[in-house]
């Protein structure tokens, strides 16, 4: 189950766009071998809102493009398919049968700015940021160069197989 809440009014959002975001989330999760019913919440916000969240949670006083709030714990260097692929979740791990993977806060305003800066479509940028955030929910990180290379490779592989290229 994917919940989308549009809390901004700077970028027009329609049902087709929301469905594309849901589709890319489903696709990325299948590519990462998430084979359990899940729940992810996505909130579309503007630069001011994401700046506040970034300051509150990361002590960084500037707007960013996307923030991820994973609900599962991962050992350093491990991702969902390493830890939970064959894991037997019990009812206490689930909410109405769904594994809560986490929340995504996406600044559509920043995504639009970056799409222009990088010379590709707004849809491609938001799909990329969504995949990036989903991978964070699944334990990927980019703090170390080796982790960053692995994460970037997975992002590009998923985008390419979903037929979205730079």
Swiss-Prot record:
It is an enzyme of class 3 (hydrolase). Its cofactor is Zn(2+). Its EC number is 3.1.-.-. This is Endoribonuclease YbeY. Signal peptide: none annotated. GO terms for biological process: rRNA processing. It is found in: Cytoplasm. InterPro entries: MetalPrtase_cat_dom_sf_prd, YbeY, YbeY_CS. Gene3D superfamilies: Metalloproteases ('zincins'), catalytic domain. Binds 1 zinc ion. Single strand-specific metallo-endoribonuclease involved in late-stage 70S ribosome quality control and in maturation of the 3' terminus of the 16S rRNA. HAMAP family: Endoribonucl_YbeY. Belongs to the endoribonuclease YbeY family. PROSITE patterns: UPF0054. SUPFAM superfamilies: Metalloproteases ('zincins'), catalytic domain (SSF55486). One of its GO terms (cellular component) is cytoplasm. Zn(2+) binds at residues 132, 136, 142. The gene is ybeY. It comes from the Bacteria. GO terms for molecular function: metalloendopeptidase activity; RNA endonuclease activity; zinc ion binding. PANTHER family: ENDORIBONUCLEASE YBEY, CHLOROPLASTIC (PTHR46986:SF1). Transmembrane segments: none annotated. Keywords: Cytoplasm, Endonuclease, Hydrolase, Metal-binding, Nuclease, Ribosome biogenesis, rRNA processing, Zinc.
């Amino acid at each position: 189950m994917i919940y989308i809440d549009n809390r901004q009014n700077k970028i027009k959002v329609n049902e087709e766009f929301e469905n594309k975001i849901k589709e890319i989330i489903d696709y990325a999760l299948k590519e990462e071998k998430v084979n359990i019913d899940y729940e992810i919440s996505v909130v579309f916000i503007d630069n001011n809102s994401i700046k506040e969240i970034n300051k509150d949670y990361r002590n960084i006083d500037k707007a960013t493009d996307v923030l991820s709030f994973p609900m599962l714990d991962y050992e350093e260097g491990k991702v969902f398919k390493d830890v939970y692929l064959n894991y037997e979740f019990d009812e206490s791990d689930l909410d109405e049968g769904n594994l809560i993977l986490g929340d995504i806060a996406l600044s559509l305003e920043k995504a639009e700015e970056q799409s222009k800066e990088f010379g590709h479509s707004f849809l491609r940028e938001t799909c990329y940021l969504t995949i990036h955030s989903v991978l964070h929910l699944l334990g990927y990180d980019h703090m170390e160069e080796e982790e960053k290379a692995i994460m970037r490779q997975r992002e590009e592989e998923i985008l390419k197989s979903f037929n979205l290229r730079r």
